[in-house]
Amino acid sequence: MKRLLPLPIAALLFALTAVAQPATPLPSADSRYQIPPTNDGLPGAGPIRRAEWFQKTWIQHRREWAARVALDQHALVFLGDSITDGWGPEMGGSFPGLKVANRGIGGDTTRGVLIRLREDVLALHPVGVVLLIGTNDIEDQAEPETIVGNLKLILAELKKSDPRMPIVLCEVFPSSASMKRPAEKINRLNELYAAAVKGDPAVTVLDTWSLFADANADAPASLFRDLLHPNAAGYAKWAAALRPVLATLGFLETEPDAFTPEPGFVSLFNGHDLTGWGFRPTPAADIEGAKRWQASDPHAAAWPVVAKAISFDGQAASDDGRYLAKAGRLIVATAPEGRRIQQLSTTREFPRDFILRLEFRATPNADSGIFIREPQLQCRDYLVAGPYNKLAKYRPQEWNEIEITVHGLAAQCTCNGELLEEAFPVPATGPIGLEGDRGQMEYRRIRIKELP
């Protein structure tokens, strides 16, 4: 026989049971940070990771970041996966004086970034974004065309939030087929990334693939602890590659360069505008050469024609913004097209013998040049881009000094004291010029001493 509980006790137990076991489960405090259980209705395409370890990492990071939204307002955001995450909350202290926010999650994909973009990044109203993403998509067998589709959506959301916000798009780092990230697939993805942003002045592509790739187009063990994640030396190399671009964007090195030329030398660049510099008419031979190149090669560089001389006296930048003066640096910025052949020249010529000294700093694989009266001495990220790739004293992504001594119709050229050219042929007179081609090149302390 079933015994019945007294009515007051039964009512109390029912009430307690109702509280302890609600018919509809209440959402957890972390539900807003969780990965959606299915892909239904989610933006983008391709893999979204849902392994238990990844979900825990995702929730933990996003919960911590939500508590820092007010503190991280107007930071430069580093956005990505474990490579970014592993750099630490302050990016290893690599950018002193710059407010940064690390928004990398280990294991994330382009689609994962797209899902969390609004809360993790846009809510901070960032001054800019440094983006490195895509390697985990490759491991999960996503096709490069799918991955770049997600990149386009990410960029569209960033631009919708702030059309003028600068974005530094880092090429996917090399890895290894042993890590399910073969070189040919990474290269294809990087090609598509570059094509997706071609012509966009707000996006600067940084060649971080050439920065790291070894002779086999893989990640070197000396810089990557597991052929995927950089070690301390690898992060230092990435930071050095970023600094020149961040300086051009106005985030670093904002103070003028305090430099006084040696006795007998005269500055050709005043450090704050392009007075004394301009564009000269494009020679007919260059026009014809450009036409032949562009007709035969769909990937040929843009090569704008200058019809008449243009002076930039008093201007902080050339009319197209490619050449600009900032804090003592004459910058040849990365062209939105990826490559664009141009030449900025002094408005005066130099018929007398002279010694020309200047310093330059190149982003990875950058290609520029110094015109000596007319012919061009290649000035590049030499160890990657050549042609002087055996230099022992060249300092990648740091300042290096070029000295050019002209006697008659020949020039001796050195870099940090190492010989580049013993007798480089030059004409009797002509200007000093700086070429723009690929990547970013900065020049400073440009001075000349005319000899008797």
Indicate where each model-derived feature is located.
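Solvent-exposed loop/turn segments at secondary-structure junctions
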Residues: S82-G86, G106-T110, T135-D140, F173-A177, ...
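Acidic/histidine-rich helix-loop elements
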Residues: D40-W53, G88, P96-G112, E139, ...
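Carbohydrate-interacting regions of secretory-pathway proteins
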Residues: K152, L252-P452
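Structural recognition of the beta-strand scaffold that forms the well-ordered cores
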Residues: A75-L79, V100-G104, G128-I133, P166-E171, ...
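Charged, glycine-enriched surface loops/patches
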Residues: V148-C170, N187-R188, L192-V203
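Oxyanion-hole/transition-state-stabilizing segment in secreted/luminal serine hydrolases
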Residues: T84-A101, T110-K152, E157, V168, ...
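N-terminal secretory targeting modules
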Residues: M1-F78, T84-D85, P89, G93-S94, ...
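Catalytic His-Asp segment of secreted/periplasmic serine-dependent ester chemistry enzymes
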Residues: P174-E253
